[in-house]
Amino acid sequence: MEFSAVNTIWVLVGAALVFFMQAGFAMVETGFTRAKNAGNIIMKNLMDFCIGTPVFWLVGFGLMFGAGNGFIGKIGGIATEAHYGSGMLPDGVPFWAFLIFQTVFCATSATIVSGAMAERTKFLSYCVYSLMISLVVYPVSGHWIWGGGFISQMGFHDFAGSCAVHMVGGVAALIGAIILGPRIDKYTKDGKSKAIPGHNLTVGALGVFILWFCWFGFNGASTVSMEGDAIVSAGKIFVTTNLAAAVATVTVMIITWVRYKKPDVSMSLNGSLAGLVAITAGCDTVSPTSAAIIGIASGFIVVFGIEFIDKVLKIDDPVGAVGVHGLNGAFGTLAVGLFSDGSGTDWKGLLTGGGFHGFGVQFTGMIITIAWVVVTMTIIFQVIKHTIGLRVSAEEEIAGLDSKEHGLASAYDGFAMAGVPTPMGTSVKAPVITARPSAPAESVPELPKEGVHKLTKVVIITRQNKLDEFMQAMNEIGVTGITITNVLGCGVQKGAPSYYRGVEMEMNLLPKIKIEIVVSLVPVQKVIETAKAVLHTGQIGDGKVFVYDIENVVKIRTGEEGYLALQDTK
């Protein structure tokens, strides 16, 4: 075979981008779950790739692309050019480039399940699952769809993996979440869903942007060529991929804005991924207009699908993996049968003048793939559950998997994070800032007579956004010593409910600051009135002021006590 440099480079760049999707999935899942499980999430995503790579090399590639029959490929040995160097290789692409490209696709399907089973799965059990999906489940269905199997022989079209990758992972996630059961306190006794917010939506958003960026390689490089018509096709694929994701995101934003009275951040991020998943099967064979329609539909599917799975089926999916990958993977598969313009298929879609044939082919292939994954993953998860166990104990789940599964006190050591339990016998100290904005006093006022000036401590709990203005105001009234501590307040804003992924929030830990001031000469009431004037907005959450009597103050450096200990002298 004569190799093409441009085709080889294109495939290798695509493989590198698809590999980096692992970072995107890790960030999305970490951000959408609680801080006490962040390290566990990272380890699971790492192991998906590191277990899947050798397994796919040893067995999976042969099952998927080996010369066998319509049902399963024939394993001719480990994946080497000598064993599989002919047959299924794309034109001009060396075996090793094709192997790594297919390896990263396998790992992508495996990692989808991590989010749906987050925060309560045994790490060992998850590793066993990861091995099995890369060893058997994904390669066999992949052979049917991409390896010359009986589904592909029907005329089935799944260009980059809405069905073969995402729906397979999404259905596996659904089965795993069902068998595993919901997290502790996810549902009330009467079955009402409770919101369990992720600890870092910023990290989650970073993950979505990484995935969106890498999806251009996921879909674009699936041409496995940059010669002839593939050059034009690659550009079109980039456009349809981007358009579907963008339209889906806007659609979700509008839906949540109407339903929840505010645009939901995490659901909008899921909307981006839903659009990407839905367009993946037909990105080469649908028009930009059809891609936009697919984006709109995927936005509706992800919002109402996630709500249905959570509130009606009572299936706990912390990151929305089933709604994003399972439901939209299935929809994306069917969308080819609806919107294909015939440029990448032997038929046109139902809505583009091709009749029911193409839609029927897509529907049949989808149902067969779902049935395969449901049966195999049910067996795998049930065997794991009844042997080594699938779920951690209640004690381990409450404490957090970082601590119990990995011996990690916190993935954020050195930071004060909500939801991270403090190990027994230790304490977590929040950062403390001591502010002295004024110059040291040159002289000490005359010592007041006994009992004239008492010592008073004023404590203020408030939001951080007005801290600078507050410190300036305190300086102006003569308060020069202020201690500020980052704290977390537990509460809910009455009369203005907030929502997380469609579920009304009951109570949450909110970042606040605790300001401590000890005064003697400065009148307490003046401190209080100044604080009220600066911090008041009229909104719930402005804060509270607490006033305490102090028996004595001792300055350690000089030994001075009482009033003198408060004076900032040289």
Functional labels for PLM-detected ranges:
Residues 404-411, 422-570:
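Positively charged, small/polar-rich N-terminal and surface patches that mediate targeting and assembly
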Residues 1-448:
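Glycine- and aromatic-enriched membrane alpha-helices
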